[in-house]
From Swiss-Prot:
Source taxon at top rank: Bacteria
Residues the entry annotates as binding ATP: K272
Compartment(s) of residence: Cytoplasm
The keyword Zinc is annotated on this UniProt entry: yes
Subunit structure: Monomer.
Motif stretch ('KMSKS' region): 269-273
Recorded GO MF terms: ATP binding; cysteine-tRNA ligase activity; zinc ion binding
Motif ('HIGH' region): 31-41
Family the entry assigns: Belongs to the class-I aminoacyl-tRNA synthetase family.
Keywords annotated in UniProt: Aminoacyl-tRNA synthetase, ATP-binding, Cytoplasm, Ligase, Metal-binding, Nucleotide-binding, Protein biosynthesis, Zinc
Transport as UniProt keyword: no
Protein name per Swiss-Prot or TrEMBL: Cysteine--tRNA ligase
Gene: cysS
Length: 463
């Protein structure tokens, strides 16, 4: 079975063939650490975490090198530090730690490499020097700019003529530019901003050159997969291609380009500038990370995803159903010889079709339920293993089923519930139905839902 990827550059679905199966390389644009990331920022984190898991499954865990950068020099970071009156490192350390905390809670594996822009200034200056020497960049008024007209393939990735790209994007107009689309590689720092010495004067790098330099140092001049949000196609990724190809005189930066769609609210793109953002750092206080992850994977990654409270509710119900099946099968060990269902693998191999993949989970959970009712331990073991393997491929079903349903219940409450359930069992055995109903009422008052089944009663906290 071959993994197929929709390549943004060629506009078609292609068989994935790594340049070196023993070193599969992927790069995803990471955070600018000046504030908490919003839920739209985490869509690529979760989507391409699934890609990372699938590649590890196909080629081996040690064969996949996944780099996700950290932008830790930026105007917004400088402004945040100035507003709070603290060093820049306080801001970047705080929000990078929060980003890691949130990504972990959403079930994203840590990337193999996490290069920071400030740790690659030497590599950035080296690449800028190559571009100037090649005639692809020029110095002007303390700046160094990329000459877009020197690169014949500029615009190929986004598939739009240069004039159209300029009209549809925020392009800085400056008198020192040879062409309006020329972009900054190096610029002078303002007072109290971080700066580094360079052949063109003290300053700091532009955003686009950071990624090109970090890709080169972390992964090489040509990589297998470059991924990110669709909004990065132009100008960021277009500019990366131009810089990297001109600096190295190569024909390809990435063999496959992948872009996830926008996350919308009421049909409008979610963004901090519009003020319509959901912050996972806050949402995670009330919502399990797996629920948020399920919601983020509920639409195909290339399609827009409309974020609503109903989406989270449905995601919670879906996971409750799956965890419920695992809970009822908890006394049977999974059959380690079993693999994820073919339907799940087939869906993932078709350009990461996560909605189709997760829909196949429910057939397996139903098989578990039937096997539990029939007392068929062989079928329970086989299907439990298949469901857990499928979950591992997509980052789901990583919690203990009992803990999933008990939620944030304290140890004291858990003990109280178990005591009441034991008394209810005794009352039912004695056919004292009024006492059993009264106990159920006490449990309801505690916010506990009791579920009777063939293996006895289980419970969960109310949503």
């Amino acid at each position: 079975m071959t993994l197929k990827i929709h390549d943004t550059l060629t506009r078609e679905k292609r068989d994935f063939v790594p340049a070196d199966p023993q070193r599969v390389t992927m790069y995803v644009c990471g955070p600018t650490v000046y504030n908490y990331a919003h839920i739209g920022n985490f869509r690529p984190v979760v989507v391409f975490d699934v890609l990372f898991r699938v590649l590890r499954h196909l080629y081996g865990e040690d064969a996949v090198v996944y780099a996700r950068n950290v932008t830790d020099v930026d105007d917004k970071i400088n402004q945040k530090a100035a507003d709070e009156g603290v060093p820049i490192s306080v801001i970047t350390d705080r929000y990078l730690a929060a980003y890691h905390q949130d990504a972990d809670a959403l079930g994203a594996l840590r990337p193999t490499l996490e290069p920071k822009a400030t740790e690659h200034i030497g590599a950035i200056l080296e690449m800028i020097g190559q571009l100037v020497e090649n005639g692809s960049a020029y110095a002007a008024e303390g700046h160094v700019l990329f000459d877009t007209q020197s690169f014949a393939d500029y615009g190929q990735l986004s598939g739009r003529p240069l004039d159209e790209m300029i009209a549809g994007a925020r392009v800085e107009v400056a008198p020192y530019k040879r062409h309006p689309a020329d972009f900054v590689l190096w610029k002078p720092s303002k007072e109290n901003e971080p700066e580094w010495e360079s052949p063109w004067g003290a300053g700091r790098p532009g955003w686009h050159i950071e990624c090109s330099a970090m890709i080169d140092k972390a992964l090489g001049q040509t990589i297998d997969i470059h991924a990110g949000g669709i909004d990065l196609t132009f100008p960021h990724h277009e500019n990366e291609v131009a810089q990297s190809r001109c600096a190295h005189k190569t024909s390809v930066l990435a063999n496959y380009w992948m872009h996830n769609g926008f996350l919308d609210m009421s049909g409008e793109k979610m963004s901090k500038s519009l003020g319509n953002v959901i912050i996972p750092h806050e949402l995670l206080e009330t919502t399990p990370g797996e629920v948020i992850r399920w919601a983020l994977l509920s639409a195909h990654y290339r399609q827009p995803l409309d974020w609503t409270p109903e989406l989270l509710e449905q995601s919670k119900k879906s996971l409750d159903r799956l965890y419920g099946a695992l809970r009822r099968a908890k006394d049977v060990a999974p059959d380690q010889a079993m693999e994820a269902p073919a339907e799940v693998m087939s869906a993932l191999m078709d350009d990461l079709n996560t909605p189709l993949a997760t829909s196949a989970f429910f057939e397996v959970s139903s098989a578990i339920e039937k096997a539990v009712t029939a007392g068929d331990t062989v079928a329970i073991a086989a299907n439990k293993a298949r469901l857990l393997e499928a979950g591992a491929l997509l980052g789901f079903l990583q919690a203990d089923p009992d803990a999933w349903f008990e939620g944030d219940a304290s140890d004291e409450l858990k003990a109280q519930v178990e005591d009441l359930l034991a008394k209810r069992v005794a009352a039912r055995a004695a056919k004292d139905w009024s006492a059993a109903d009264a106990i159920r009422g006490e449990l309801d008052a505690l916010g506990v839902v009791v579920m009777d089944g063939p293996a006895g009663a289980t419970w969960r906290m109310k949503d």
